[in-house]
């Protein structure tokens, strides 16, 4: 009789040894950055990194300097922390860094979408055409109508100025931005009330997926959570299917243009459904959280909300409603709000923390701003974490942890774009949208959504925190590296609609 216990044990030892051997044997070569493999074979620093990426990278930078390589789950990541050296990485004139390969694996895992030739360029092309210029103007009009519908027609809010409503600020912002954004991009049927109910149900499922997302990316889910992720993926593929889209009117030109490209490439409808899921996530995953932080900072800083309201009055006039069902709003005003622009940019500096990743597909030499050169090894991943290296750099942004609503304003009220590090002008003084080939193609629409929502809230509503002395919530450390951070807990607030004439 075969003793399967010892046999399986020996087999596991062999497999583990095979997996760990490359990491155990790896040594730092001449000209390479400092190498820190950690104490656990293969895993390296993976657990500390996932527990709190920000604190881990701070420790590594203190230990090794501005460039270092760490082992994370069998993969080697080299972090560059000097923003004055970012330029050549983002331009990649040597063509030795690749973003697409990593991104394709990620979207296949998370959304089930298998990339086709030319779709990355297609997304950027469609976004340039429909999420900027005249295309953006048209979409802003649709978004204003959707916000009016979600915030006024459907909620049944009392127009009595004495009627206060209480809610949780994060959920409030996320729900409104998600539902209005979803309806604006994916269209309506003839039954708009039913559309809103479905959008609300979709939001609830979206939040379930959202909460699992960080650990899903790192494959750290429990068995039941894996089953839940599978259920949610199938649900989104069904609810966002192209067959359902055919029943709707007013699908955005942006989405329609991209789906047309996929059809012309012969992409099956089932894969188009998964593409829609990816686009929903890309368009709605950060605007709600960003709006939450922006409104919370305004409520915690009376001088800031006063300045935004004064600016809004200058460019919009007195706030009013049209037929009590829609906001009267001059969309052109979005281009003339430098104070609000500074508030949003400061919010993103404080709370947007993406990671920029590039696969090194050939040995790559980086010349730092100091003149020192480092060799990056083929197969490693080059990583930038601008939140730590740029946003929180006191040389670039004095008192970096403090919210200053006018940080991005010149004394004359114009936008400030001149920032310096060690006396040298720095081009990348904030990087909330990524940069280079991985820059967010929908950033202009996302900014418009956030600005439009904030302007409607501060001009048409009285707002106050239930507890004015409540401290800002900490960020959820699981979300470092995934765009706009989310709070560790929600904050209660009150609001009431201004009286109508």
Swiss-Prot record:
Keywords: Endoplasmic reticulum, Heme, Iron, Lipid biosynthesis, Lipid metabolism, Membrane, Metal-binding, Microsome, Monooxygenase, Oxidoreductase, Phosphoprotein, Steroid biosynthesis, Transmembrane, Transmembrane helix. PANTHER family: 7-ALPHA-HYDROXYCHOLEST-4-EN-3-ONE 12-ALPHA-HYDROXYLASE, PTHR24306. Its main location: endoplasmic reticulum. Its cofactor is heme. It catalyses: 7alpha-hydroxycholest-4-en-3-one + reduced [NADPH--hemoprotein reductase] + O2 = 7alpha,12alpha-dihydroxycholest-4-en-3-one + oxidized [NADPH--hemoprotein reductase] + H2O + H(+); 5beta-cholestane-3alpha,7alpha-diol + reduced [NADPH--hemoprotein reductase] + O2 = 5beta-cholestane-3alpha,7alpha,12alpha-triol + oxidized [NADPH--hemoprotein reductase] + H2O + H(+); chenodeoxycholate + reduced [NADPH--hemoprotein reductase] + O2 = cholate + oxidized [NADPH--hemoprotein reductase] + H2O + H(+). Belongs to the cytochrome P450 family. Pathway: Lipid metabolism; bile acid biosynthesis. GO terms for biological process: bile acid biosynthetic process; positive regulation of intestinal cholesterol absorption; response to cholesterol; response to nutrient levels; steroid biosynthetic process; sterol metabolic process. The gene is CYP8B1. The keyword Membrane applies. GO terms for cellular component: endoplasmic reticulum membrane. The modification Phosphoserine is found at residue 326. The keyword Lipid metabolism applies. The chain crosses the membrane at residues 1-21. This is 7-alpha-hydroxycholest-4-en-3-one 12-alpha-hydroxylase. Its EC number is 1.14.14.139. It is a single-pass membrane protein. It is found in: Endoplasmic reticulum membrane; Microsome membrane. A cytochrome P450 monooxygenase involved in primary bile acid biosynthesis. Catalyzes the 12alpha-hydroxylation of 7alpha-hydroxy-4-cholesten-3-one, an intermediate metabolite in cholic acid biosynthesis. Controls biliary balance of cholic acid and chenodeoxycholic acid, ultimately regulating the intestinal absorption of dietary lipids. Mechanistically, uses molecular oxygen inserting one oxygen atom into a substrate, and reducing the second into a water molecule, with two electrons provided by NADPH via cytochrome P450 reductase (CPR; NADPH--hemoprotein reductase). Liver.
């Amino acid at each position: 009789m075969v003793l399967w216990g010892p046999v399986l044990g020996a087999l596991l030892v062999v497999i583990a040894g095979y997996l760990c051997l490359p990491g155990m044997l790896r040594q730092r070569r001449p000209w390479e950055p400092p190498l820190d493999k950690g104490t656990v074979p293969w895993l390296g620093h993976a657990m500390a990194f996932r527990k709190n990426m920000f604190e881990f990278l701070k420790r590594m930078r203190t230990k090794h300097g501005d460039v270092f390589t760490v082992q994370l789950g069998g993969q080697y990541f080299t972090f560059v922390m000097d923003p004055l050296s970012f330029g050549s990485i983002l331009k990649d004139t040597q063509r030795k860094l690749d973003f697409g390969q990593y991104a394709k694996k990620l979207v296949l895992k998370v959304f089930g979408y298998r990339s086709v030739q030319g779709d990355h360029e297609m997304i950027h092309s469609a976004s340039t055409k429909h999420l900027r210029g005249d295309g953006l103007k048209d979409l802003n009009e649709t978004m204003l109508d959707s916000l009016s519908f979600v915030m006024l027609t459907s909620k049944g809010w009392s127009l009595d100025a004495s009627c206060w409503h209480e809610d949780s600020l994060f959920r409030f912002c996320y729900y409104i931005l998600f539902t209005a954004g979803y309806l604006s991009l994916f269209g309506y049927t003839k039954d708009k009330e039913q559309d809103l109910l479905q959008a609300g149900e979709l939001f609830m499922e979206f939040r379930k997926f959202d909460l699992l997302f960080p650990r899903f990316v790192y494959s750290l889910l429990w068995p039941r959570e894996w089953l839940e992720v599978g259920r949610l993926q199938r649900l989104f593929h069904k609810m966002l299917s192209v067959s359902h889209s055919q029943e709707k009117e007013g699908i955005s030109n942006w989405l329609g243009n991209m789906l047309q490209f996929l059809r012309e490439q012969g992409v099956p409808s089932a894969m188009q459904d998964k593409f829609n899921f990816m686009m929903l996530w890309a368009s709605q995953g950060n605007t709600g959280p960003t709006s939450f932080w922006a409104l919370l900072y305004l409520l915690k800083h009376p001088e800031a909300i006063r300045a935004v309201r004064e600016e809004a009055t200058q460019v919009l006039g007195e706030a009013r409603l049209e037929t009590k069902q829609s906001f009267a709003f001059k969309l052109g005003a979005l281009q003339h709000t430098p104070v609000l622009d500074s508030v949003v940019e400061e919010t993103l500096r404080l709370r947007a923390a993406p990671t920029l990743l590039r696969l090194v597909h050939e040995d790559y030499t980086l010349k730092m701003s100091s003149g020192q050169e480092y060799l990056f090894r083929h197969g490693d991943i080059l990583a930038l974490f601008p939140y730590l290296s740029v946003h929180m750099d006191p040389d670039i942004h004095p008192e970096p942890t403090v919210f200053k609503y006018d940080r991005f304003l010149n004394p004359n009220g114009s936008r400030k774009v001149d920032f310096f590090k060690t006396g040298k002008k720095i081009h990348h003084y904030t990087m909330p949208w990524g940069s280079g080939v991985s820059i967010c193609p929908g950033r202009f629409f996302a900014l418009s959504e956030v600005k439009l929502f904030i302007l409607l809230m501060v001009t048409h509503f009285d707002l106050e925190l239930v507890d004015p002395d409540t401290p800002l919530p900490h960020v959820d450390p699981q979300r470092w590296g995934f765009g706009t951070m989310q709070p560790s807990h929600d904050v209660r607030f009150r609001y009431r609609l201004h009286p109508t004439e």
